[in-house]
Amino acid sequence: MKKIFLIVIFLIGLSVNAQTSKELVGKWQLVKWTKKGKEKSIQEYYKTDQVYQVFKENGDFESLVGEETHKAKWKLSKDNAELTIILVIMPVKFSVDYFDANKRIITTPQMGTFEYKKVTE
């Protein structure tokens, strides 16, 4: 269950101004986590600051936490307002607060708000 929560934390939705799933494809690093208005420590929670999400064109998804890799599938709603990550048979939905080619901000009621930056491999 903790691993599912780790994956859920990395999941981030997309929306705003005709952004497409093509812009989501790539590697994204978690740079900020806020819950109930307070910034949380990525390093303390994950035991590393190397926390990434990788979105592939074929719908494959990888959550990378340090040396751990968790695989899933992803899909973006037609209006780009919701990102769904499918973990085995359990879909996890994220709303999108902000998304452009280099930055994503998503929020989930359980874990808070996550900000990611796009990185080159």
Regions found by a protein language model. Name each.
Residues 1-4, 19:
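Positively charged n-region of N-terminal signal peptides that target proteins for export
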Residues 4-13:
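Sec-dependent N-terminal signal peptides
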Residues 16-121:
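Lipid interaction determinants
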